[in-house]
Amino acid sequence: MGQKINPLGFRLGTTQNHHSFWFAQPKNYSEGLQEDKKIRNCIKNYIQKNRKKGSNRKIEADSSFEVITHNKKMDSGSSSEVITHIEIQKEIDTIHVIIHIGFPNLLKKKGAIEELEKDLQKEVNSVNQRLNIGIEKVKEPYRQPNILAEYIAFQLKNRVSFRKAMKKAIELTKKTDIKGVKVKIAGRLAGKEIARAECIKKGRLPLQTIRAKIDYCCYPIRTIYGVLGVKIWIFVDEE
């Protein structure tokens, strides 16, 4: 039988890079991993907390990032602060944190970085290490599976048909130069009693080719009918 494997871990070291760069003695290695997890969770919690505060006011975002409910267009800028990944580089006295984000409107606000640094400093074990936070905007947001998954989640929570949400997400990828995309949603779709999976694929998706650069994400969506699982594969290019 064929065995499924995570496309990112399968290509780590070839087309995928590590998101943490540091060295530690074997006895301190677990502490470093826990510190990285705390830093990433702290940043994600900060984004989520402040995103809820500003959900009632309009935030400038890409005009195509919208949800259609009851024949009205609803701006979804409040749900567009999606982090694609966080890089952590550790030196002797400095921790460099680079946040790769799709639409960094929230973090551009005055005092946002300083407030985030204070929260992160509490999570860092050593008081002698200083934090250096950098923000890097993703050039093509709809090329990232995390942003597409967040887009689908936002539409499903607003009672949009899951098929329409999947098709719209694939349409957004037409603006990029990707070679293939696959979207899969599993769970109690449309509130049905029996769970099932629906999948839409466009273009090529060579999962068994190691030199093929494939981005992937698995995203849970909590709805009134239960938890839905969204998986997105994007075939970027072949090296």
UniProtKB/Swiss-Prot annotation:
GO terms for cellular component: chloroplast; cytosolic small ribosomal subunit; plastid. It is found in: Plastid, Chloroplast. The keyword Iron does not apply. Keywords: Chloroplast, Plastid, Ribonucleoprotein, Ribosomal protein, RNA-binding, rRNA-binding. It comes from Oryza sativa subsp. japonica. PROSITE patterns: RIBOSOMAL_S3. Belongs to the universal ribosomal protein uS3 family. Its main location: plastid. This is Small ribosomal subunit protein uS3c. GO terms for biological process: translation. Signal peptide: none annotated. The lineage of its organism: Eukaryota, Viridiplantae, Streptophyta, Embryophyta, Tracheophyta. Disulfide bonds: none annotated. It holds the Pfam family Ribosomal_S3_C. PANTHER family: 30S/40S RIBOSOMAL PROTEIN S3, SMALL RIBOSOMAL SUBUNIT PROTEIN US3C. The keyword rRNA-binding applies. Residues 43-139 form the KH type-2 domain. InterPro entries: KH_dom-like_a/b (IPR015946), KH_sf_prok-type (IPR009019), Ribosomal_S3_C_sf (IPR036419), Ribosomal_uS3_bac-typ (IPR005704), Ribosomal_uS3_C (IPR001351), Ribosomal_uS3_CS (IPR018280). Part of the 30S ribosomal subunit. One of its GO terms (molecular function) is rRNA binding.
